[in-house]
Amino acid sequence: MTRLLLAAVLSGGLATALPAAAQFQKPEDAVKYRQSAMTVIAHHFGGLAAMAQGKLPYDAKAAAFNANIVATLAHLPFTAFGEGTDMDLHTKAKAAIWKDPAKFKAAQDKLFAAVAKLDEAAKAGTLDALKPAVGATGEACKGCHDDFRSK
């Protein structure tokens, strides 16, 4: 029942994310939205990374759950980098996001591919399958953060 409810909520969230830019009344709302989405993603990815590094015991069920959440939510923050959110709004987003949108889009696509593979690897149910997918996803995150996020 809990999984069904979570799936419904996540599916609804993803479906509404596509027109999300139109939902923000103020640029500050978009910034808060993308920061919140990134926080949730980081929390769930952190558990996967800890398992891959041996800092947490491997739990196939938890890995599959967390990877699915990461893969589902990964698309959400990118709907909130719209017009007007490039000003100083207490955000770490660099101007490069808006100056080179093609490069930013390429980084997004790399992340989306990595999280899809992460989700599949976690479903395999083995730590050996999970480790390289966590590494690739971490690299995709880092690549975007290096180019588009201030320290």
Where are these regions (language model features)?
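Sequence context surrounding c-type heme c attachment/ligation sites in exported
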Residues: F24, E28-A60, N66-K151
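N-terminal signal peptide c-region/cleavage motif recognized by signal peptidases
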Residues: A17-P19
